[in-house]
């Protein structure tokens, strides 16, 4: 797996009176097995950059390549990219929506067209990996502490078995149990 970011720039609300440059001429290569950290002040473009890695945001200028293919070329499989590059945002607990923890973590893999058995195995393994006890699987995620909610949301991303996971605001994912 490789992601190449080639000279991307991004302008919010381009062509309006509210235009704001978030990224300017950013380039990097992320290879399989690498850990990359982004450090910067609030509003410096870290989250905007991360959103480019799986095509949630299209650069104003420049290109992004996944395994050698431009992700914005016609025919590129964006669904596969998004299943391979997982994003965990600053407040991942805001992406929880199901009535039970286990159902919430099953949502992503289920949408990959996997068998029910494979979906459940992935959910189980991911929840265990982030330290959620089996006896909590059928509780509402909304009854959990903030740290537990974050871990459930992270399990949902991990259950997709992405090649890469990008965390915005990694320190925000430290848990309080």
Descriptions of predicted regions:
Residues 2, 11-25, 74-77:
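A short, flexible loop at the N-terminus of ABC-type nucleotide-binding domains that lies
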Residues 169-177:
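Single conserved hydrophobic/aromatic residue that forms the stacking wall/gate
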Residues 117-135:
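Conserved ABC ATPase "signature" region
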Residues 39-41:
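The feature captures the beta-strand-to-loop junction immediately N-terminal to the Walker
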Residues 62-73, 81:
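Conserved ABC transporter NBD signature motif
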Residues 54:
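Helix-to-loop junction immediately C-terminal to a conserved catalytic motif
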Residues 140-144, 148:
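Conserved ABC ATPase signature
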């Amino acid at each position: 797996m490789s992601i190449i970011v080639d000279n991307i720039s991004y302008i919010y609300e381009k062509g309006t009176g509210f235009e704001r440059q978030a990224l300017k001429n950013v380039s990097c290569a992320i290879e399989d097995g690498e850990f990359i950290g982004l450090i910067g002040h609030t509003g410096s473009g870290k989250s905007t950059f991360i959103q480019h890695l799986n095509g949630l945001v299209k650069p104003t200028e420049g290109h992004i390549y996944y395994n050698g293919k431009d992700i914005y070329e016609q025919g590129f499989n964006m669904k596969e990219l998004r299943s391979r590059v997982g994003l965990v945002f600053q407040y991942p607990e805001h992406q929880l929506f199901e009535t039970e923890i286990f159902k919430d973590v099953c949502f992503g893999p289920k949408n990959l067209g996997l068998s029910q058995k494979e979906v459940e195995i992935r959910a189980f393994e991911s929840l265990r990996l982030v330290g959620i006890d089996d006896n909590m699987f059928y509780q509402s995620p909304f009854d959990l502490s903030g740290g537990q909610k974050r871990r459930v949301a992270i399990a949902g991303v991990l259950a997709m078995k992405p090649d890469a996971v990008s965390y915005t605001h990694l320190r925000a994912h430290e848990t309080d149990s």
